[in-house]
Regions:
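Conserved HGGG/HGGXW glycine-rich cap/lid loop of the alpha/beta-hydrolase fold
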Residues: 37-89
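Conserved loop-alpha-helix segment in the C-terminal half of the alpha/beta-hydrolase fold
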Residues: 71, 230-267
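Catalytic nucleophile serine of serine hydrolases
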Residues: 127
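Flexible "cap/lid" loop of the alpha/beta hydrolase fold
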Residues: 131-138, 144-174
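Catalytic active-site module of serine/aspartate enzymes centered on a nucleophile-bearing elbow/loop
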Residues: 256-299
Length: 299
C-alpha cells in the first residue's frame, strides 16, 4: 500500500492497456534506457516518417492519452508518445535517480532522443508536458524543428486560484471519487471517455515521484527562441485564462501561431479534443522550419 492510498498495479495495467488499445493497429512500444531510468514509448507511423515526440500532461495522463490524434499524426510522422519518468505509466525510474530539476529533464529528453536515434524532431506536449517541451526547445533548439503547445500550464501565465482550490482535496488525499469529482468540475459538460477516466482513477496511489516544477521560462529566452510554435488553448479551460496566455505568448515568442479550441476544457485534452485537432496539428507540423535554420534547407 502506498502512503497515498491503496494501489492495485494489475488494475492500473489493465486500465492502461484499454486506452492503448484505442491507438492505430500496428502500434508498438519500446523501452529506452536513460540515466534516470527506463522510458516507455508508444510508437506508430511509417518507419521513414519525420519523428514527432509527444509528451503527456501530469498525473495519470500517460502516453496513451494521445489516442484521438495518433491516427492523423501518424499519416506523415513516426509518432513517439512518452510516459514521463516518475509519473504514472510504464516508465521506471532508476532507484532514486529521477529528474529533480529542469536541467535534469533536459538531460533525460536528450538521452531519450539519442536512444531513439533521433537528432532533430517535431515536439509537442499538453499541459505539464507542454511545459517540459518548451523548456527542452529552449535547452536544445537545434533538436526541435517545430513545437506545438496544447493548453500549456506555467509557461506564460499562472493557475487560477479557483482551479488550485478545487484540486487541493485530490492532491492532499487522492481517492478515485475525488479524482472523478475534480475532473467533472473542470471539464463541465464535456463527455469523458470511460476507459480514460478509469485509468485516472486506477492511478490513485501510484508510487510516483515528485514532479519537477519551477518558474516560467525566462522572457529573454523565449524572445530568442528561433523555432516555429503553435499554441492551442482550451476555450473552456478552468486552469488559467486562455486570453491572457495567448496575449503573453504573442509578446514573447517571435514565431508563434495562437488559436482557441472552442467548447473544450483543459483536462478534456487531448483525448476528448474537438474534431479537426489532429488535422490542425498535422498541417502545422507539415510546414517547414524557420528559414535558414539547420535542417530546413530545401524544404
Amino acid at each position: 500500500m502506498s502512503a497515498r492510498g491503496p494501489y492495485d498495479a494489475g488494475r492500473f495495467r489493465d486500465a492502461y492497456d484499454k486506452v492503448v488499445a484505442k491507438w492505430p493497429a500496428g502500434t508498438g512500444a519500446v523501452t529506452v534506457p536513460t540515466p534516470f531510468g527506463e522510458t516507455h514509448v508508444l510508437v506508430t507511423g511509417p518507419a521513414g516518417g519525420r519523428p514527432l515526440v509527444l509528451l503527456p500532461g501530469g498525473g495519470a495522463a500517460t502516453s496513451a492519452s494521445w489516442y484521438a490524434q495518433a491516427a492523423e499524426l501518424s499519416r506523415t510522422h513516426r509518432v513517439h508518445a512518452v510516459d514521463l519518468i516518475g509519473a504514472p505509466g510504464r516508465s521506471t525510474p532508476a532507484g532514486d535517480r529521477h529528474p529533480r530539476t529542469v536541467a535534469d529533464l533536459g538531460g533525460w529528453l536528450d538521452a531519450l532522443l539519442d536512444g531513439l536515434g533521433i537528432g532533430e524532431t517535431d515536439l509537442g506536449g499538453h499541459s505539464y508536458g507542454a511545459w517540459i517541451a518548451l523548456h527542452h526547445a529552449l535547452h536544445a533548439p537545434e533538436r526541435v524543428r517545430r513545437l506545438f503547445l496544447l493548453d500549456p500550464t506555467q509557461c506564460f501565465a499562472g493557475f487560477k486560484a479557483a482551479y488550485l482550490l478545487h484540486a487541493l482535496p485530490m492532491l492532499l488525499r487522492p481517492t478515485p471519487r475525488r479524482v472523478r469529482a475534480f475532473l467533472g468540475w473542470e471539464t463541465g459538460a464535456t463527455p469523458l471517455d470511460a476507459d480514460w477516466l478509469a485509468l485516472q482513477e486506477a492511478a490513485v496511489g501510484f508510487p510516483e515521484r515528485r514532479p519537477v516544477t519551477g518558474p516560467r521560462p525566462a522572457p529573454e529566452a523565449l524572445r530568442a527562441l528561433d523555432v516555429p510554435v503553435l499554441l492551442l488553448l482550451a476555450g473552456n479551460s478552468r486552469t488559467h485564462d486562455p486570453a491572457e496566455v495567448a496575449a503573453r505568448a504573442r509578446t514573447l515568442l517571435p514565431h508563434v501561431e495562437t488559436d482557441l479550441l472552442p467548447g473544450v476544457s483543459h483536462h478534456a485534452l487531448p483525448q476528448s479534443a474537438p474534431p479537426g485537432l489532429g488535422r490542425r496539428l498535422g498541417d502545422f507540423l507539415a510546414a517547414p522550419g524557420v528559414p535558414g535554420a539547420p535542417g530546413t534547407a530545401g524544404e
